[in-house]
UniProtKB/Swiss-Prot annotation:
Its main location: plastid. It is found in: Plastid, Chloroplast. One of its GO terms (biological process) is translation. The gene is rps20. It comes from the Eukaryota. The keyword 4Fe-4S does not apply. This is Small ribosomal subunit protein bS20c. One of its GO terms (cellular component) is small ribosomal subunit. Binds directly to 16S ribosomal RNA. The keyword Endoplasmic reticulum does not apply. Coiled coil: none annotated. GO terms for molecular function: small ribosomal subunit rRNA binding; structural constituent of ribosome. It comes from Trieres chinensis (Marine centric diatom).
Length: 93
């Protein structure tokens, strides 16, 4: 339990930041799964429109990863590694 006002404020700020960080991490995971699912559909169908759909999803994932990195949710190297892995998946497909 907090003993003074500044400690109480820190508790509130930490909770706010925890929820914001959780949003970014969860969103990146969710969009990554959707992107990989789009890639699987493209691998099966070989339809150019499916590849475009996957590329659009990739740009959304990139955007969220970059925003999370900017807000210190992800370390910059972690963000770069995630983006690199996703890009290589597209090249393989």
């Amino acid at each position: 339990m907090a003993n003074n006002a500044s400690a109480e404020k820190r508790i509130l700020i930490n909770e706010r930041n925890r929820l914001q960080n959780r949003f970014y991490k969860s969103s990146v995971r969710t969009l990554t799964k959707l992107y990989l699912k789009d890639l699987e559909v493209y691998k099966i169908s070989r339809n150019p429109s499916d590849k475009e759909k996957a590329k659009n999803r990739l740009s959304l994932v990139y955007s969220l990863i970059d925003k999370g990195s900017k807000r210190n949710v992800f370390h910059k190297n972690t963000a770069a590694r995630k983006k690199s892995k996703l890009a290589s998946q597209l090249k393989i497909a």
